[in-house]
């Protein structure tokens, strides 16, 4: 039995988001980006367990109503940065997986934008090459809330990351099944389940998360005064999570002083 089934908070939050935003359809082929962080490991197990739920609800030998799932691990080549343990873990789970290594030595400069762009291109190429129709990313409610605050504080706008959005010209949908999951709930689940977690080895990416950490500290301080803060935040941002059904942008986590808007573009053939 998956730990997901026995963790009621995580189960309820994930199923609520999956069903409210109609994230998964019969016959979908879903590609999970597995970074090795807590959220991506939790996402992998949540979707793996959700497959079993659908199989019980739809005991059709033909498999109708059940989706296919694979995972992609993107390793940017830094010294002492080895994500191969994730591959071994995926093998043990029996999850279809793809290990893609990107050499960084050809680039004269290094930035967060470069890391994001390279990963996105690799992930898209894997999805296209193997026929996946949905990309699953692991941003959680705390990150959604921080993104919302950043857009208000820094850009004078009201926006956050969308939960289920079609990517124009890519024949893909992007979903965020952990949109209603608290970071602390995910951390508790990962610890209880004993899931392997790997920290990024990219120093620039780590430094660029300072702004997001600051915003999360603001939220934590306010939550001490208002225990229902995140329930209110869910009500406030839910309309933004499915504001548009068509988009050619992806709002990624706030890792700089401004909300990052990353454009997904087709890589050259």
What residues fall within each predicted segment?
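Mobile, glycine- and charge-enriched loop segments
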Residues: 98-110, 172, 243-259
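Electropositive phosphate-/nucleotide-binding environments in soluble metabolic enzymes
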Residues: 4, 8, 117, 180, ...
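Residue-level detector of flexible, active-site-proximal loop/helix-junction positions
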Residues: 78, 104-106, 165, 181, ...
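ATP-dependent adenylation/nucleotidyltransferase module used to activate substrates
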Residues: 1-150, 154, 184-192, 267
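Short, basic, helix/turn surface patches
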Residues: 117-131, 164-169, 218-237
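The feature marks non-catalytic terminal segments
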Residues: 195-269
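Catalytic subdomain that performs nucleotidyl-dependent activation
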Residues: 63-69, 142-221
């Amino acid at each position: 039995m998956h730990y997901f089934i026995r963790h009621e908070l995580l189960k309820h939050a994930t199923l609520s988001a999956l069903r409210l935003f109609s994230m998964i359809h019969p016959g979908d082929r879903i590609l999970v980006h597995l970074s090795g962080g807590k959220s991506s490991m939790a996402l992998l197990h949540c979707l793996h367990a959700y497959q079993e739920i659908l199989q019980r609800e739809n005991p059709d030998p033909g498999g109708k109503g059940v989706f296919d799932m694979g995972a992609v691990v993107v390793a940017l080549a830094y010294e002492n940065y080895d994500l191969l343990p994730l591959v071994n873990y995926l093998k043990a789970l029996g999850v279809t997986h793809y290990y893609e290594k990107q050499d960084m030595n050809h680039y004269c400069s290094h930035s967060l934008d470069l890391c994001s762009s390279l990963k996105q291109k690799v992930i898209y190429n894997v999805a296209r090459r193997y026929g996946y129709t949905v990309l699953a990313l692991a941003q959680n409610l705390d990150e959604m809330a921080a993104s919302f605050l950043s857009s208000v504080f820094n850009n004078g706008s009201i926006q956050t990351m969308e939960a289920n959005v079609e990517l124009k010209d890519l024949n893909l949908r992007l979903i965020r099944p952990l949109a209603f999951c608290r970071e602390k709930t995910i951390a508790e689940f990962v610890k209880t389940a004993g899931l392997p977690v790997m920290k990024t080895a990219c120093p620039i990416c780590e430094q660029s998360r300072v702004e997001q950490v600051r915003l999360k500290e603001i939220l934590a301080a306010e939550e001490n005064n208002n225990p229902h803060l995140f329930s209110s935040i869910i009500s406030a941002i839910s309309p933004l999570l499915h504001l548009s059904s068509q988009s050619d942008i992806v709002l990624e986590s706030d890792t700089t002083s401004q909300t990052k808007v990353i454009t997904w573009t087709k890589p050259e053939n």
